[in-house]
């Protein structure tokens, strides 16, 4: 899938997330949590990368994080670089969907115990609620963009 096909696919994914409010409320925990500051509304424009963050062989840059105009859909985009041999991120699941676009190197996307190989130019997706992680599967750094779309996380 190239970037044009990916951008054509993104509106369908965004539309699908509007069907999630019942699922989102069912997945929320009863444990009280800290109140988060409201996220800004995302508007059309260009978003340059923010400052580098990370450690232990993994670095990243956030491009944007906020709410789409519909008001109930959160979107976030960042770029991650993993050095060879870096332990994968913690296995997790979320209320949102995650889409990866591999820029360079070889990554492994594991969802619900199934591992799939991704190379530069590939797109991977993890649907809301699936257990997942991404790991560097090569002997050179892997770099990928991540777009998350879905209801706000509690």
Model segments located where?
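A short, N-terminal "cap"/entry segment at the start of jelly-roll beta-barrel domains
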Residues: 2-5, 13-74, 83, 154
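Conserved short histidine dyad/triad with adjacent acidic residue
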Residues: 76-94
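Conserved hydrophobic/aromatic beta-strand scaffold that supports enzyme active sites
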Residues: 77-81, 99, 123-125, 146
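Short, conserved beta-strand element in jelly-roll/cupin
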Residues: 81-82, 94-108
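Histidine-centered metal-chelating micro-motifs
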Residues: 87-89, 108, 124, 128-134
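Short acidic-glycine-tyrosine-enriched beta hairpin
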Residues: 114-128
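Ligand-binding loop in jelly-roll beta-barrel domains
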Residues: 128-153
């Amino acid at each position: 899938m190239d970037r044009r096909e990916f951008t054509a696919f993104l509106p369908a994914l965004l539309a699908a997330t509007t069907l999630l409010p019942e699922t989102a409320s069912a997945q929320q925990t009863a444990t009280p949590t800290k109140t988060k500051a409201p996220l800004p509304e995302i508007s059309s424009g260009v978003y340059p990368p923010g400052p580098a963050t990370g450690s232990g062989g993994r670095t990243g840059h956030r491009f944007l994080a906020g709410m789409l105009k519909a008001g109930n859909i959160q979107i976030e985009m960042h770029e991650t670089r993993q050095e060879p041999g870096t332990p994968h991120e913690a296995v997790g699941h979320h209320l949102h969907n995650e889409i990866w676009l591999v820029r360079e190197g070889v990554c492994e996307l594991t969802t619900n115990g199934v591992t799939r190989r991704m190379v530069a130019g590939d797109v991977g997706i993890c649907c809301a609620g699936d257990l997942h992680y991404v790991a560097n599967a090569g002997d050179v750094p892997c770099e990928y963009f991540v777009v998350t779309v879905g209801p706000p996380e509690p």
